[in-house]
């Protein structure tokens, strides 16, 4: 790769970004506070663009990148990127799910243990000087059937972290077959069996037109033994209104959400506010602000994952 090729970085990245990319012959223009108008104006000067989830790489932006050779997504999801147009323009797309998969797996285990052991309620009560052991009696993860919906980098990482808990792990992935042939701690099942047996549903699918609000009232109601839901994928794949209905009816024991349909909480509609408040007030829900993959270690590791992939481009 020729030296001094310029790339534009428009979102917050770990401080190692300059050193890591300089090591593969790329100079970073680090502009995390850049406006979209500025981005469009200066993009023609760059061969690469590095983004996170807040930047929409759409037709308007792509067509301005006359010398653009690649887009790097610092993370896993690419729902904010016009993937088809990039391919049509022969612009490479790189993401970095390898960089934060361990973080997501660990976060999921933490959320699941909190649900099973009612730690949100127990913590709240003790802080209020209530000492109620019986009402906070929890369940063991051992022998539970944990269903992983989508077995990519994140789903497989969650399965790896569950190995030591003596639970039964089943997985369903519509677009993969034989993905458990070399591992003995996960059973690959068809959707019918998955819905019949899963007690815990952990969602690990990308947001696409097909998966948008896939998990609605009817879909969730088709599960026969479902007790807990964990979503660390994309908020829009799960209908929170329908989740609220099922949860408040007592048909679920708990839900842990790292992602929401609308994560800009100051823009909620009145209907969304009612739904969110009902879920926030529920004793058996746990929330985190889209941080499952957001650890100090993953923050730096993502730089190295992207750099390694980008270094293989033939300029």
Ranges and model annotations:
Residues 1-94, 196, 216-221:
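An N-terminal-biased, well-structured beta-alpha scaffold segment characteristic
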Residues 23-24, 134-225:
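Rossmann-like dinucleotide/phosphate-binding beta-alpha-beta segment
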Residues 26, 91, 186, 284-286:
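Short, conserved active-site loop motifs that form the nucleotide-linked donor/cofactor pocket
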Residues 54, 76, 199, 205-207, ...:
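Short glycine-/small-residue-rich Rossmann-like dinucleotide-binding loops
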Residues 56, 77-80, 99-100, 145, ...:
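Residue-level detector of alpha-helix initiation sites
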Residues 62, 66-69, 81-93, 203, ...:
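Beta-strand-loop-alpha-helix segment that lines the small-molecule cofactor/substrate pocket
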Residues 91, 97-145, 157-160, 164:
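Phosphate-binding beta-alpha-beta segment of Rossmann-like dinucleotide-binding domains, i.e.
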Residues 226, 232-315:
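Rossmann-like dinucleotide-binding domain for NAD(H)/NADP(H)
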């Amino acid at each position: 790769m020729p030296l001094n090729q310029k790339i534009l970085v428009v979102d917050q990245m770990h401080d190692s970004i300059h050193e890591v990319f300089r090591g593969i012959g790329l100079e970073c223009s680090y502009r995390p506070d850049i406006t979209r108008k500025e981005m469009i104006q200066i993009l023609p000067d760059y061969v690469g663009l590095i983004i996170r989830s807040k930047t929409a790489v759409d037709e308007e932006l792509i067509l301005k990148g006359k010398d653009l050779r690649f887009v790097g997504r610092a993370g896993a999801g690419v729902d904010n990127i016009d993937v088809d147009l990039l391919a049509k323009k022969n612009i490479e797309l790189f993401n970095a799910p390898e960089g934060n998969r361990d973080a997501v797996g660990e976060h999921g285990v933490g959320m699941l243990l909190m649900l099973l052991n009612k730690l949100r309620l127990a913590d709240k009560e003790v802080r209020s000087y209530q000492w109620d052991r019986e009402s906070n009696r929890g369940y063991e993860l051992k022998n539970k059937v944990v269903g992983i919906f989508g077995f990519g980098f994140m789903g497989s990482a969650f399965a790896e972290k569950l190995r030591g808990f003596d639970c039964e792990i089943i997985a369903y992935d519509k677009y993969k077959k034989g993905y458990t042939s070399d591992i003995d701690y996960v059973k690959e099942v068809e959707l019918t069996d998955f819905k019949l047996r899963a007690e815990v549903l952990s969602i690990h699918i990308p947001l696409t037109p097909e998966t948008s609000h896939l998990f609605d009232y009817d879909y969730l109601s088709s599960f026969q033994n479902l007790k807990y839901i964990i979503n660390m994928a994309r908020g829009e794949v799960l209908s929170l209104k329908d989740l609220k209905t099922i949860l408040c009816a007592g048909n679920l024991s708990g839900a842990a959400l790292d992602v929401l349909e609308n994560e800009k909480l100051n823009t909620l509609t009145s209907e969304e506010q009612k739904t969110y408040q009902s879920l926030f007030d529920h004793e058996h829900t746990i929330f985190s602000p889209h941080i499952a993959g957001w650890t100090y270690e993953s923050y730096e590791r993502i730089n190295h994952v992207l750099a390694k992939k980008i270094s293989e481009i033939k300029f």
